Amino acid sequence: MNPPKSAPDAQGLSYRDAGVDIDAGDALVDKIKPFAKKTLRDGVLGGIGGFGALFEVPKKYREPVLVSGTDGVGTKLKLAFHLNKHDTVGQDLVAMSVNDILVQGAEPLFFLDYFACGKLDVETAATVVKGIATGCELAGCALIGGETAEMPGMYPDGEYDLAGFAVGAVEKSKIIDGSAIAEGDVVLGLASSGIHSNGFSLVRKIIERANPDLSADFHGRSLADALMAPTRIYVKPLLALMEKIAVKGMAHITGGGLVENIPRVLRDGLTAELDQRAWPLPPLFQWLQQHGGVADAEMHRVFNCGIGMAVIVSAADADEALRQLTEAGEQVWKIGTVRASREGEAQTVVV
């Protein structure tokens, strides 16, 4: 059977006519290879571009357990589009996953990213991936692969979405699951760099209501830069701490804030009582609360309120842990203690 003949005046269609530019995709791969190369570490087998990425678990592990995490950047991307600022969201993407797997004691080994858009802008995508590589360097993990999906009609021009995937390893005997947490333990709070990557739907609503000048000075930088500050990556100082001190539990303070994330590592019958006077509420959160009329309780369940990671140790280890983390460059406060829960009480209370 012969194929149907084209009409004499019909023009042949190409993938580019359909909105997908293969040449742009190839150009992006060439641009990002040097960024990925800077993240290489022991265990990486092969380079970018294969069907699958290969990684050999380091031989230092006797009984390695793999720990995986995946996340995105949420509606912080909407603010990035509005500001045309794409250099920090890549670090946000890495931080959200590596900080999550870190809380179980895992050393991040490698990271993969997914970049989806309607029309690929090579420069914008390369800027995002450069930020991803920066995040991987800060976390000590390798950027070993990813996917760039150009899907015409799926996203408005100038917009994209991101997803990240991190895999780490922890010695089976050293998994941190919160089971050792007991009454009298101390909750340390490590400072956040800002809003991080959660609560931006509320942030954007507050901006809509307040209509501020985002380019105006805000404590030494623009308000836009304060809002877009990349999520802090806690991997290296906390891995070093775990080598010296028995860390009983950790909580990455993401969506749900302090009051919904700390309970994820507490056994039934235990409550973390946090003293909100123990650490300063950063000016950016004060600005959000003031301009949005946000209640204290809502602030604590939406935003990190200045604490990006909670670390639980015994009272005997608290001072030494605080000293080590401070020497490593972290701002740290004793923000609370663990005690027996009272009837009907939440597992984390802020007083």
Swiss-Prot record:
CDD domains: PurM (cd02196). Pathway: Purine metabolism; IMP biosynthesis via de novo pathway; 5-amino-1-(5-phospho-D-ribosyl)imidazole from N(2)-formyl-N(1)-(5-phospho-D-ribosyl)glycinamide: step 2/2. Its EC number is 6.3.3.1. The keyword ATP-binding applies. It holds the Pfam family AIRS_C. One of its GO terms (biological process) is adenine biosynthetic process. It catalyses: 2-formamido-N(1)-(5-O-phospho-beta-D-ribosyl)acetamidine + ATP = 5-amino-1-(5-phospho-beta-D-ribosyl)imidazole + ADP + phosphate + H(+). GO terms for molecular function: ATP binding; phosphoribosylamine-glycine ligase activity; phosphoribosylformylglycinamidine cyclo-ligase activity. It is an enzyme of class 6 (ligase). It is found in: Cytoplasm. Keywords: ATP-binding, Cytoplasm, Ligase, Nucleotide-binding, Purine biosynthesis. GO terms for cellular component: cytosol. Belongs to the AIR synthase family. This is Phosphoribosylformylglycinamidine cyclo-ligase. It comes from Burkholderia thailandensis (strain ATCC 700388 / DSM 13276 / CCUG 48851 / CIP 106301 / E264). The lineage of its organism: Bacteria, Pseudomonadati, Pseudomonadota, Betaproteobacteria, Burkholderiales. The gene is purM.
